Amino acid sequence: KANPDEIQQMYLMSDFVTAKSTELKIQIMQHFYKDQLKPNTKDNHRWWEVIDRTTDEVITNWDYDEETGEVIIHDTIPYHAYTVSFLAFVIWDPVHMYNALTNDWQGEEHQMTFDVRQPKTQKYVLDKFRKFCEERDDVDVVRFTTFFHQFTLQFDEFAREKFVDWFGYSAS
């Protein structure tokens, strides 16, 4: 919680949206569960990509309105389809979310994912592990018998399964 900028992230893609005029607004979180995912708007022109799917051209003339959650694409071609690929923070651990929704857990605090590759998070985890070992004189060896990986679970705006891959590591 102390470092929300170090929460695990994933790339998402908006729906295909057809332009009806020379400006198009795409609600990027439409059909995604807002309790699970939050767009990472830091340096979005570097990490996000807008594509004219009719021509496969990458579009650079766009802005993001954080208040409305819309990407505004300028100089669009009417009747061309466009998408936005964007980074989003995984603000609710997918496995915890799945269990909470499936089992109707009420009042359950949302567990967050964290990315141990990030410097502050890595330090936190290593310090906690060191402390665990130092406080236990009877422990000589710590054996990891399970390696944690994240299933890919994306839910829609109604908290239903949108995309689920129980066998992959794409959210790790």
Residue ranges and their predicted role:
Residues 1-172:
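Glycan-processing catalytic domains of CAZymes
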